[in-house]
Amino acid sequence: MKKLNVGVIGLGQRGLSLIFTILACEEANIVAVSDIVEEKRKAGVARVEEIRKTTPVAYENYEDLLKDPNVEAVFIASSWEEHIRMAIKSMRAGKITAMEVGCAYDIEECWELVRVYEETKIPFMMMENCCFDKFELLSTSLARAGKLGEVVFAHGAYSHDLRFEMLENNYNYRLGNYLKRNCENYPTHDLGPIAKLLDINRGNRMLSLVSVASKAAGLKEVFPKYEKGKKHLNDAVKQGDIVTTIITCANGEVITLTLDTTLPKHYSREFTVRGTKGYCVQEANMVLFDCKELHDFYEPHKALQRWMDNGENYNAYLPDMWRNITQKEMELGHGGMDYMAFKAFFKAAINGDPMPVDAYDAAAWMCITALSEQSIAQGGMPQPIPDFTKGKWLTRPRLDVMEFPTVSED
């Protein structure tokens, strides 16, 4: 079997944990690691040695890793600010490039990502793991099978109280963003699966958005409880506690996104798809089709009691990898979706297939941050969303991240 020699850039919590995931893929060797912090470099080397009994080269400067002729593919797990810049340098160095999710700081860096991809033709994938999650793929499969009818609306969220994480971790880079920016700062977890389902950049595209933000109260309230927070007692927090974004699409659909990371709430991506024949609700693991019984309940909790967790009844629509997933694979990050994302990356890289989440997708999804920042600053004024494909979206064929089964209704 062909194996790829991988270099990992960024060995924080995410990068270090994904060494397990990468090395669980038989297609990969990790031959180099890089981080500016020495203790993190040592931790990365030790983890590779523990798993594979081999010793990767450790680089303080990631550009030295990019010059290493033994490195064929690069995985970038640095801070948000560095993602696109590092990915551009990686492609220019001729390395197959995988980039962790994040946000854009301006539209021009999104255009530059696309330009460099088009110039170099180097395979690039943004590792949006939520595109590979079970419920998102189930919903997409049901949509492809026509079970939902014509899809007209989708909603997603990044609902995750991050205050403890931001104020406990000395190396956490999010806090600086929350002090300086007010935007939809983490759009791809919720938008990515929706965009794939709606064929964004492949027969459809996002046209415009409006964003509004609430006041910022949740983070300031907990500053006194943490030493790191006490340093910012007199600082203003720009990031609103709740940001709502509405996106219009060329084919007539509407997408809503919610950012909710500084108030008490359970984790949820709120993934919801509405069609003319049915809908899917991730929070309840629920799939509902049009029927008389839907109209019998005027108290929503009673409908939830009846249909909650019925998503398991439609497992026949799941891709093979989800129907056959092992416990070990599920333990390789976020219930299995991390492993599936890397398997898809290595398969495409080795076989020369199109990447399931490419540079056009990364640019379109990440630019939402910069545009939402502009919209919020202008009191919710609409912002046009660029067409990073420059018209190719009209003819690019559909590309799902996994193949869906054909299900007989007999």
Report each predicted region and the residues it spans.
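Active-site beta-strand termini and strand-to-loop segments that position acidic
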Residues: 245-251, 275
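N-terminal Rossmann-like dinucleotide-binding module
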Residues: 1-51
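C-terminal helical cap and adjacent loop that interface with cofactors, partners, or active-site loops
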Residues: 17, 266-274, 281-284, 291-410
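Predominantly a Rossmann-like dinucleotide-binding segment in NAD(P)-dependent oxidoreductases
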Residues: 10, 120-125, 130-237
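Beta-strand-loop-alpha-helix segment that lines the small-molecule cofactor/substrate pocket
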Residues: 68, 73, 79-132, 146
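Glycine-rich phosphate/pyrophosphate-binding beta-alpha loops
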Residues: 257-267
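Conserved SAM-binding strand-loop segment of SAM-dependent methyltransferases
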Residues: 55-61
